[in-house]
Every structure is written in C-alpha cells, then in structure tokens.
C-alpha cells in the first residue's frame, strides 16, 4: 500500500525542523545526551515494568531515509543540502537502556541516547511512542498478575486494542508483565506465545441451542472449553456442557467452561458445584467480562470459584490510565572544548525540573535480605560497589534519608548500541518474563500493593543533587539578567 515506506519519518515535524536548524548552524554533529524517564508511576502503582526495547532495536536498525521520505520532505520545503545530509544518514547513536522486565520507577533514566545532536533529536518521538505504550501495558499486566498470584492469565484484548500494532505489541508487553498466553494468533506466531481460544456466542446462535453447538465443537476439537452463558448459564449452559462431556467421554478433553456475563462471584460458585457434583472436579472455570485487577480483587474477596482469567479491554488499552507520560530530555551537550556540559530544564512545577548530567542508575540490594533497598542515581563512571556505605536521601525532602551497608549495586542502564553498532543480545520473550518475575520477587511487599503502595526510594547522589541546585540558581539568574537587558 505504501511502497518504500519506513519508520524513519515516524516522528514529529518539529524534530525535523530542529534537525535542519542544527544542520544550518553547523552543530548537528555536536555530541549530546538525552534521557527518557517518567514523572509518576502509572495507575498510582509502586513501580512500572519496562517494556519496548525489542521494538526500539528494530526501529533503530532500520533508521535510514528512503527516497520517498526524501521526496516528501522536499515537498514540505526542506532545502537541498539538508536533504543530502539526510540521504547519507547513518545511525551513530550510543544507547543504554533498562532491560525489558526490569522494574523501573519515577524520575530515573530508563533509556539514555548519546551521539550527534541531530540524530538524538530525530529518535525522540518513536522511542517515547514505544516506551510509553508497552511499559504501560506490561505494568497493567503485572498488577493483574499480583492479584491472581499463580492462576493462569490470558490476554483477550485484540478486538479492543487501538489498531493492529497495538494489539500485537501490547500482547507481547502483557506477557512480559505476567500473562501466560493470548487469543491473538499472529502474536502467538511472531513471539512464540501460547494461544488459547474457545468459541463465541455466535456458534451457539448459529446452531440455535447449546447442545447442537457444543456437539459440533466437540466433533471438531479435542480440547473443549464451552461458553455457557448464551441463554442461561446455570439452567441450560452448564448442564448442556456436562451432557456433551459425558456423551463424548474420552473422545474429547473437557477442559472446562467459560463465563462471560452476570454476577461472576455468585455464578462461578454455582458452576463449580454443578461440575463437581457431575463428576468433573478437574474442569476449570474460565472468566472474562471487562475484568481488571480491581474487579478480580473484589471477586477474590467474595471467594469466586474462577480458575483462569481472561482479561481484554482493560488490559490492552490500559483502561484507567491510557498514557504513561514518559519524557525525553537533553541532559548534556558538547561544549567548545569537546567536553560534555550539563544542562537543565526549569519549570514553575518542581516535578518538571530535569536532573542534569549523563547518569547511571544503581539498584541497591541488601545482601542479607535479598531485597531491593532503593535506586541510587550517580553520574556515569561512578562505581558504587567500591563504597562501603551509601547515604541515600530524598531529592525533594532531603531530611528523609538512610544509610545502607552490606549491599550489592547493579547498574540499571546496560549497553544496547555503541556508536550505531548493536552490542546487546536480545533475550527471548520467555526469558524476559522469567527475569521480570525474579525482579518482582526482590521488591518488598509494601511497594507491590495494588492499593496505596509505599513510595520506592529513588535517590540522587549528593554531588548530582548539589549540581542541580547550583544550576537552577545559575539559570534563573541568567534568565532574569537576559530579561532585564531587554
């Protein structure tokens, strides 16, 4: 449909505008450092689950301007020498990132991009687009997983997703967050995700009754989960499922029944009773119907007899918070001597003031307890493991502090690209999910609560904090002086 298309123009127009400014001013190759972070954990949660790195890599690997890209930019009025620069464009970025499945927190760098200024500027939109969506879905799935514990969680949201790409990559993100499988066949194929499908109400309506529909399904498929709420769950649907299961006997594997409507707590208890009394104690009860972590928590409080959870709309759309709000800010720029100079963005809102400098985030873990004590942000090049103790204090409320001893410090940001060359081996999706579970187990329970979690410590090294305060003072004075001169 769109020949010679590429994702390189998957960006905002002002990025191209700024690139041309940098090019015309001769500063497009100046070294710069940008960092991605979000200001508030999503869903009022205690953490987020990082996802999207694999798609960032796919995007950066193909970052070139096609002829149709250049023709289109020419039609917008960009000049010849700038277009020639774009024609010869070769990605030279150095990228560090959290690993997919890492638990990440507000106000810490989760992706860091370094390289020629114009190139850093170009990739902002796509990176934020990817991280904002996939991290949100992975976090939502993790919240649901924390409520259902070890029970199966299936992603059922494709038809409600915001178009096809969102369905595919959202499914993958949901698996990172803890989903066991999906109804999306293409996602199963692309990412080797287990797929599960039962049947819709349409099958029953086509045959006119549950009995004929269930028989037809059982004649075709050995593994059977019957949808029992088309007409009357307790008086027709479940008794008919039991009847067909008995008639077919060993010819089918009667896995259970699915409920998609009604009072799931009450109905599931009655269904469980019917299945048990009929001699099918191993048949599972599958539930769907606009579920999320809050609904499931409520159902569990009512002791609902549900074995498998199918979560669709409210997972794939991150229904209660459809945006993460991650931002991409410049933190350092090359000066006239070839050294990186720290930069800062000021704001009337304290939470929107950026933290200057190229940084590393260290996950501080107690050797004694094996639990994460907090994240400690230092300038790049500092090795926290050489320190016997750490002074950690809140960057806003500095009187809140603690000293940590006998710890291990692991860097959060790992090398993905070095000067345009991919140096990171992408793990499989199952490896990412296992890693995410391991990291989740290291978090104290008070940070994992679905409701009113405790704030996880994300602290600045004292020199960064002091430099930030000094830069705020310097930039305000400079801004006032410039304004006064006018």
What does each model-identified segment do?
Residues 30-87:
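N-terminal, Lys/Arg-enriched amphipathic/low-complexity engagement segments
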Residues 196, 257, 285, 307-309:
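Hydrophobic residues within beta-strands of alpha/beta enzymes
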Residues 52-55, 136, 428-432:
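Short amphipathic alpha-helical segments
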Residues 1-30, 34, 44-45, 283, ...:
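Gly/Ser/Thr/Ala-enriched C-terminal appendages of enzymes
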Residues 1-30, 40-42, 77, 83-92, ...:
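Buried, small/hydrophobic-residue-enriched core segments of structured protein domains
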Residues 71-72, 139-143, 157, 448-455:
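Short coil/turn segments at secondary-structure boundaries
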């Amino acid at each position: 449909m769109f020949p010679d298309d590429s994702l390189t123009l998957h960006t905002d127009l002002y990025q191209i505008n700024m690139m041309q400014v940098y090019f015309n001013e001769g500063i497009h190759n100046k070294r710069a450092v940008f960092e991605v972070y979000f200001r508030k954990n999503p869903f009022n949660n205690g953490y987020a689950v990082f996802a999207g790195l694999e798609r960032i890599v796919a995007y950066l690997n193909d970052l070139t301007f096609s002829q149709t890209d250049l023709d289109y930019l020419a039609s917008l009025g960009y000049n010849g020498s700038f277009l020639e620069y774009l024609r010869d464009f070769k990605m030279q970025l150095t990228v560090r990132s959290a690993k997919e499945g890492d638990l990440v927190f507000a106000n810490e760098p989760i992706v860091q991009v370094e390289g020629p200024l114009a190139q850093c500027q170009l990739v902002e939109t796509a990176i934020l687009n990817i991280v904002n969506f996939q991290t949100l879905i992975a976090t939502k799935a993790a919240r649901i997983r924390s409520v259902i514990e070890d029970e199966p969680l299936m992603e059922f949201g494709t038809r409600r997703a915001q178009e096809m790409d969102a369905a595919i990559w959202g499914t993958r993100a949901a698996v990172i967050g803890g989903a066991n499988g999906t109804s999306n066949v293409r996602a199963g194929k692309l990412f080797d995700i287990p797929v599960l499908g039962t049947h819709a109400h349409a099958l029953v309506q086509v045959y006119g009754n549950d009995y004929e529909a269930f028989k037809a399904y059982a004649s075709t498929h050995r593994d059977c989960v019957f949808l029992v709420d088309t007409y009357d769950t307790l008086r027709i649907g479940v008794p008919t499922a039991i009847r067909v299961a008995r008639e077919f006997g060993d010819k089918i594997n009667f896995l259970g029944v699915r409920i998609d409507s009604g009072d799931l707590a009450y109905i599931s208890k009655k269904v469980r009773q019917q299945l048990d009394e009929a001699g099918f104690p191993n048949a599972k009860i599958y539930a769907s119907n606009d579920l999320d972590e809050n609904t499931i928590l409520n159902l569990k409080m009512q002791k609902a007899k549900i074995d498998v959870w199918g979560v669709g709309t409210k997972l794939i759309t991150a229904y209660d918070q459809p945006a993460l709000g991650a931002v991409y800010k410049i933190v350092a720029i090359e000066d006239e001597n070839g050294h990186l100079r720290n930069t800062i963005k000021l704001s009337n809102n304290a939470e929107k003031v950026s933290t200057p400098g190229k940084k590393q985030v260290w996950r501080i873990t107690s050797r004694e307890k094996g639990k994460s004590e907090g994240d400690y942000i230092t300038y790049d090049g500092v090795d926290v493991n050489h320190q016997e103790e750490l002074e950690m204090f809140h960057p806003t409320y500095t009187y809140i502090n603690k000293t940590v001893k006998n710890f291990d410090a692991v860097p959060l940001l790992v090398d993905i690209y070095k000067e345009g060359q991919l140096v990171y081996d992408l793990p499989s999706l199952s490896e990412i999910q296992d890693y995410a579970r391991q990291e989740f187990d290291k978090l104290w329970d008070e940070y994992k609560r679905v409701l009113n979690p405790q704030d996880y410590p994300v602290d600045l090294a004292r020199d960064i904090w002091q430099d930030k305060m000094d830069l705020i003072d310097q930039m305000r004075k400079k801004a006032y002086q410039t304004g006064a001169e006018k």
